[in-house]
Every structure is written in structure tokens, then in C-alpha cells.
Amino acid sequence: MIKYLKSRLNIIIVKCILGIIILSLVFGTINNYFNRDTTRYIAKVNGEEISFITLQKMYIDERKKQEKILGQDFEKIKKNKKFKEETYNYILSQLINNILLEQYTKRMNFNIQDNEIKKIIFNIPIFQENNEFNKKKYLNYLSSKNLTHYEYVSLIRKKLNTTYLINAISETDFILDNEQKKIIKLLSEKRIIKKAIIKINPIINNQKVTEKEINNYFDQHKNEFYTPEKFKISYIQLKPNKFKIQCSNEEIKNWYKKNIDKYSNQERRQYSIIQTKTKNEALSILSELKKGEDFSKIAKEKSIDPFSSEQGGNIGWITKNFVPNEIKIANLEKIDQISNIIKFNNNFLIIKLNKILPKKYKKISEVSDLIENEIKYQKSLNTYKKLKDKIAIIAKKNINRFDLILKKTNILPKETNWFDKDSVPKELQNPILKKIIFKKGLLDRQKKLKSHSGLIVLNDHQSFLLSIKNFQKKRIKKLKDIKRNIVNKLKYIKAVEKTKNKLKKILFQLKIGNEHILKKENIIFEEYETVSRYDKNPNISVIFAMPHPKEEKNVYTMYQNKNKNFVIALLDKVYNEKFSNEEEKIIIKYLEKNNIDVTFQCFLQNLHRKATILYNKTDNF
């Protein structure tokens, strides 16, 4: 029992997650049966149609799910064309995958027994009354969906076949021993290397750049050299926490009296239980308890609940509002009162009320600071709403008179410094505000401090009124202002090209065994170091792409590191460091789980390759 109470929430969460997975992948096409539309279809999968209505309904459902998950962020992207297209394509691909899986199970003659389907139907909550199957409810449901009993059974069989197929694929999470050994060997590999660093800055400083090269680069890259449009904004910002609000002791007292239930510890009750497998066992125990036998002793000896039995049946303190229904129906109101036998799942309970901690009200002195904050917040919210409504009315009447709005409301505006898209002030870092500022036509850029945005009401009780104080157009920079940048860029390009060509020649000499070139070019290697695939080094893939050294012949490569310097790497030795048994198990487990997804995707890709899928043009979806 106690295990059941503690794990109830986790079970619900797990069931929800599994439900979402199954519904999104397996039961997606159920609307094909409930919304038969033979006039319009979106796609045909091996001759089987996906109706326009099915896709439309699932698209709407998916958008609702997105809104729940994303919350306020959904408003920012819901009209985005790319986002809508991605949602549409995702739904359509899921529907196609569903049909391909159903068709595959049909070809493979997957078959679910009738008695299994009967159990499922009998246990569906919407067909039950008083925890028992209700035939009338079932038939009414079929009638509402325009289905016969046999069609519904066929539909469930088809969906369950698909579910079993997915489960079968997910259970093939093994990796062959030979594959395991290869992967473990690969992951455990270590390499001993030496590096010689050729610094780029001295080479950059030695490069020469002509005026012609500078002019040509400027002409070819003009779009990279411009000053973005810039703004100075004058604005009104309304937020409840910006108002200076006072609160008297009298207000605190009145608030406390009106809301006293908020400032109390809820009643708590302590219960003990005895859980049995059969009703006869429960009756026998209840008879003993009525004769005065010790509840705690019997719970330890005879209760089958593994958690509470060790505590003499005690399941701890429970706040009155959260007492489970199994205990509520016992209707225990007196200390030491014992319930009758209560059916619980397939078992039986006897419950005892041990103690009651009555509701306790906190003193006003304990909660006065909390109440003061609540009053101030409520008053500031009221002040905010009144001022917001006042400004909204004045702004509507004075469309091109930001200055007049300030005068009538007696508000001093805030003003920003110059900013562009990459340096928006913190107060204006809101997608809606940024759109109004930067999108042409939403704010008049000519009527400075006259035109305004109208009152913009954001979430979290925040409002803005914006006006442009000053504006600079986007313009190409003059060559004289960016000449130094171009010179540095060209010097760097030349230095990189020159260094690459030189190092390629050096590597060629090293490859044919001429290691004297290192001394000639004054290339000095650092100390040996050991590297693994897990090192946080952006160039680690280059090191592990080097071939293994053979017959004591050194292997070399080159790359550019994060500091832009060039590196010649010498691979001296390759060896494997043995993992512990525990580490190997963790790696294999991870690979197996990853393998499920890869297997399933490959399976779907194979079904797609063999299928004939025709798409119908959809305008104004």
C-alpha cells in the first residue's frame, strides 16, 4: 500500500510518456476511420490514402501540444513559415510511417488473439461504469464514431500489431560480440604524439599588401563593410514593481482577518494499515482487532505490504487535503478508530487512525512581512492597470503626439544610447519590441518623438510605449575607415597560404624519409604527450585519422589549432588501455540503446524505399 502511494505520481508520469510515444507513432492514423473523406487526400501509400481531414486534425492537435510545451515562446514562432512547414512535414511523415508499419504487419501475418482484444476493450475507462464494463457506453461510443463492433476490433488489432512490431524492434538491442570488441578497441585507443608549433603572427607581419589588392578586396566585399541602422529610442515602461507603494498596519490586520485560512498549517493525520491477499484473511484479522489485539503487532506479522509492515503498519503523516480515496472511504474521524475491510486493487485493507494534528493558525506577527508584500503587490498591480488603461486611451487619441502623451500623463520617459540589432538595451530585449523597432513601417522614422508604437502590453504585467528619438540609416563604410582591417585580413590570408604551401613541402620530405628538413627549417618538437578520443581538443579527429606507424617509420600530419597557429604532429605510438569490466558494461549498454534507434530508422527507410508514395498538391492548408 505505502509503495503504491509513494510511486503513484511516478507511474502516472511514466504512463503519460509512454502514452505520448504510442499515440504519436502508432495511433496517429486512427482518424482515418473516424473522418472518412473520399474526395480529398494528401498522399497515397501503396494505394492507401491519407485524407486531408486526418492531416488537418493532427496538425491542429500538434500545434496545441507545441503551445502547451513552449508556452509564451509559441507566440513568437507560431506564424513563422518555416516552423509551420516543419510541423506539417513532421505530421505527414508520421502518418506515412504508421501506414507503412501497418501494411508490413499485415504482410507478415501478425495476429492478436480475440481474447486479448476483449481484455483491452473491457479495460478502457470510457466504457466502464463503477469499475465494470458497460455495454451501453461501448455501443454509444461506436455509434458516435460511425463504427461497427467488428470494424472497431479490426482497428484495435491493426494498431496492436503495429505496437508489437515496434516492441519487437526495440528488443533487438544486442550488438554482436565481434562488433563489441571492435568498438571497445576503438574507444580504448591511446596515441603518443609530439607537436611542433609554427606561430602565424611573425609570418603575418612579414607580408606585404599593395594598394591595388586593398581596393580589389574592398570592391569584392562591400557588403561586409557597412554600418548597420542605428536607433535612439525614447520610451515609457510600466511595471508593477516600479511603483512606490505604502502599506499600513491597519491594512495588514484587515488582510490577515480576511485571508486567515491562508496562514495556517493544514490538519495532518497519521494512519496505519494492514494489507491482505484475501478477504477471509482480512475478516480473521478484523475479528482479532475487535477482541483487542494489538494492531501494530498484527501488521508486523501478517500485513503483506513490505514497507509499512516493518513499521507496525504505520504509513506516516498525511495532510488532510491529500488523503487517498482508499483511506477517505474508511471515514475515520476518531483516534484509534479502525475501519471495516476495504477492497484495494486485488487485495484488502484494514486502516487505523493513529493521531490527528489539528489545523493551526499562524500568529499575525509570524506572517506580517509576507502579508505586507502581498498587499503591496496587489496595490501596485491595481496602480499599473489603471495607468495602463489611461495611457492606452490617450495614445489612441494622440497617434502622432508622443510628447503630448508624456505631458498628459506626467511621466518622464527613459532614453537609450545609440544601438543596433546586435546591441539592443536589456530593457528592450523582447522579440515583440525588437520587431516593432527594426521592422520598417511599424515606427515612423521621420517623425522623431512624435510618432509612437501605441501601448504594447506584454506578458508578466509589463507595458511599453516606444518612440524614435533619433535614427541613422544603414550605410557602406568608407575605405579609409576600414583600410587597416582589410590590410590585416589580406596579410593573414597570404600568411596562411604561404605557410600551408611550405608545410606541405616539408611533410612530403618527411614522408620520403628526409628528416634533416626539420633541422634545416628549425622545427623543434615539444615533449611527448598521450591523447585519447575523449580529449577536449577540436583537432583530436585529425590525430586519430593518422595511419598507424609501421617499421619504426614516423607518421606526420599538419593542422591549424584554435589560436590559428600551424602544428606539425608526429605520431610515435598507438596502444590500447584496457577498460574495467564495469566501464565496458556501461559502454555496451549505451551502444545497445543507441542501436535501437538506428535499427528502427533503418527499418523505416527500407519500407520507404520499397513503397510507392504519391503526394497530392495541397493549397491553403
Curated annotation (Swiss-Prot):
GO cellular component, one term: plasma membrane
Stored SUPFAM superfamilies: FKBP-like (SSF54534), Triger factor/SurA peptide-binding domain-like (SSF109998)
Pfam families: Rotamase_2 (PF13145), SurA_N_3 (PF13624)
Subcellular location, record wording: Cell inner membrane
UniProt keywords, alphabetically: Cell inner membrane, Cell membrane, Chaperone, Membrane, Transmembrane, Transmembrane helix
Residue ranges constituting the PpiC domain according to the UniProt record: 228-355
Ranges per topology, Cytoplasmic: 1-10
TM segment ranges: 11-31
GO molecular function terms attached to this record: peptidyl-prolyl cis-trans isomerase activity
Membrane-topology descriptor: Single-pass type II membrane protein
PROSITE patterns: PPIC_PPIASE_2
Periplasmic side: 32-621
Primary localization class, coarse: membrane
NCBIfam families: PRK10788.1
Job of this protein: Chaperone that functions as a gatekeeper on the periplasmic side of the SecYEG translocon. Facilitates the translocation of precursor proteins across SecYEG by interacting with the translocating substrate. Also plays a role in the release of newly synthesized secreted proteins at the periplasmic exit site of the Sec translocon.
Family according to the record: Belongs to the PpiD chaperone family.
Subunit details: Interacts with the SecYEG translocon. Binds to the lateral gate of SecY. Forms a complex with YfgM.
Protein name: Periplasmic chaperone PpiD
